[in-house]
Amino acid sequence: MYYPFVRKALFQLDPERAHEFTFQQLRRITGTPFEALVRQKVPAKPVNCMGLTFKNPLGLAAGLDKDGECIDALGAMGFGSIEIGTVTPRPQPGNDKPRLFRLVDAEGLINRMGFNNLGVDNLVENVKKAHYDGVLGINIGKNKDTPVEQGKDDYLICMEKIYAYAGYIAINISSPNTPGLRTLQYGEALDDLLTAIKNKQNDLQAMHHKYVPIAVKIAPDLSEEELIQVADSLVRHNIDGVIATNTTLDRSLVQGMKNCDQTGGLSGRPLQLKSTEIIRRLSLELNGRLPIIGVGGIDSVIAAREKIAAGASLVQIYSGFIFKGPPLIKEIVTHI
């Protein structure tokens, strides 16, 4: 397959520049006959989850296509679902560059992007143009300059604007790169947010005559007690699913490696075992009461199977996709 050669060339570039270059090419072909250049035939392996039918259990995690610019081209590669975003109500530039770093030996990435995106209105226009026939998730967050205590308003604004176009909505309260965001995972703040989100979901269901499930994305750095409290809150508020996990602040597996001391969230292979353990513990706590979407360090069929064995109904990839390319999609879907 050609990807090892493509990767070698892309890895000569700064990581964010490589991302921008790749998306520039994908934007050119998305929605055109040239999508055939990236199209892969993968077997149909339907999974029912959150009331939706996924063509196969493998999805693209949020963060790669923040603005929904390349939905069709990414869909042509064989993903059963694509999660775009994280998107915020207003455009924002994110954190200062450089803000994305490779840990090549560990096949990991550290990012402190900071929800850089062109805003929810722009994303909706891109979604309207797409023809992807898989499940489209839209991941939403709060603007950096919105005080945490008013953060729920940003989620509600995004929900209102995307509801008609989303297969499911992912609530990102676990990025380590927006100050204070992770505090929304705890106690009263979480209950307050989930109450508001559930009320808004009910209102929008009545308005649009369709039910769009809500999944909450959690961090891998939760203690046992915190994880139990989060699981309890999700069940009490009738949330439809949980995405486990986001990136980690833990650097124990990458000590001494180039870029290991960079601030931000670590993803890729170093996150693999940690996220799988969170899924296992979460699954025991939830006991089948809501489904888990497993993400974190999946870079092989074995890693995907481990997530499912731990309790995930669906899995997503991001860093593994960067390091292994489109062949990883076909490999996982075929053999999972």
Curated annotation (Swiss-Prot):
Gene Ontology biological process terms from the UniProt entry: 'de novo' pyrimidine nucleobase biosynthetic process; 'de novo' UMP biosynthetic process; pyrimidine ribonucleotide biosynthetic process
PANTHER family from the UniProt entry: DIHYDROOROTATE DEHYDROGENASE (QUINONE), MITOCHONDRIAL, DIHYDROOROTATE DEHYDROGENASE (QUINONE), MITOCHONDRIAL-RELATED
Needed co-factor(s): FMN
Function, in words: Catalyzes the conversion of dihydroorotate to orotate with quinone as electron acceptor.
Protein known as: Dihydroorotate dehydrogenase (quinone)
Keyword Membrane on entry: yes
Cofactor note (record): Binds 1 FMN per subunit.
Catalytic activity: (S)-dihydroorotate + a quinone = orotate + a quinol
Keywords: Cell membrane, Flavoprotein, FMN, Membrane, Oxidoreductase, Pyrimidine biosynthesis
Pathway field: Pyrimidine metabolism; UMP biosynthesis via de novo pathway; orotate from (S)-dihydroorotate (quinone route): step 1/1
Gene Ontology CC entries for this record: cytosol; membrane; plasma membrane
GO terms for MF: dihydroorotate dehydrogenase (quinone) activity; dihydroorotate dehydrogenase activity; FMN binding
Membrane topology, record value: Peripheral membrane protein
SUPFAM superfamilies: FMN-linked oxidoreductases
Catalytic site positions: S175
Taxonomic superkingdom: Bacteria
Pfam family for this entry, one: DHO_dh
Keyword Transit peptide: no
Location, primary (coarse class): membrane
Family the entry assigns: Belongs to the dihydroorotate dehydrogenase family. Type 2 subfamily.
Localization (cell): Cell membrane
Assembly description: Monomer.
UniProt-annotated binding residues for FMN: A62, G63, L64, D65, K66, T86, N139, N172, K217, T245, G268, G297, Y318, S319
Source species taxonomy: Bacteria, Pseudomonadati, Pseudomonadota, Gammaproteobacteria, Enterobacterales
Positions with a binding annotation for substrate: K66, N111, R112, M113, G114, F115, N172, N177, N246, T247
Effect upon mutating S175C: 500-fold reduction in activity
EC numbers on record: 1.3.5.2
